[in-house]
């Protein structure tokens, strides 16, 4: 299935990207991947609250083929496999190594030996801090859906849509 998705990137000047940049942070939910939002509103919100170093962010539009993705949002079987895999690995770490599984260890294991080895990416629901997702206090009624893309060949196009201001400052001025 082809999905229209949005990639948020910190704006570092007038030159726009020709392809997305992979996130390589150890605390990224699915480790090293190209992260996309399913909603342009979520992409803009992420830019405003997290892309603060330059005071601006760019939003790019892409078509992503998600046929071989693990869909933890809309596919119940995929969700149950994902949930069970996490719980088994966390328990194994606790019982055999006597420690809690870190996010980095989970992602490294799944990419090298487990669940993510045979998929092109993951569709997942993020927890939102955007007040527009909470019309009723305490109830997130809108899903904030992201894609973590492992196989960049599934990204069919990459087009700059707009630049906007974040809630930050420009440290390069």
PLM regions: where:
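ADP-ribose/NAD+-binding catalytic cleft of ART/PARP-like enzymes
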Residues: 1-31, 48
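Active-site and NAD+-binding cores of ADP-ribose-processing enzymes
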Residues: 3-8, 15-18, 58-173
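Short, solvent-exposed loop/turn segments at secondary-structure junctions
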Residues: 11, 41-43, 129
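Residues that flank catalytic or metal-binding motifs in active/ligand-binding sites
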Residues: 30-33, 58
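Active-site nucleophile-adjacent alpha helix/oxyanion-hole segment immediately C-terminal to the catalytic cysteine
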Residues: 35-38
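Short active-site loop/helix that positions an aromatic residue
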Residues: 41-54
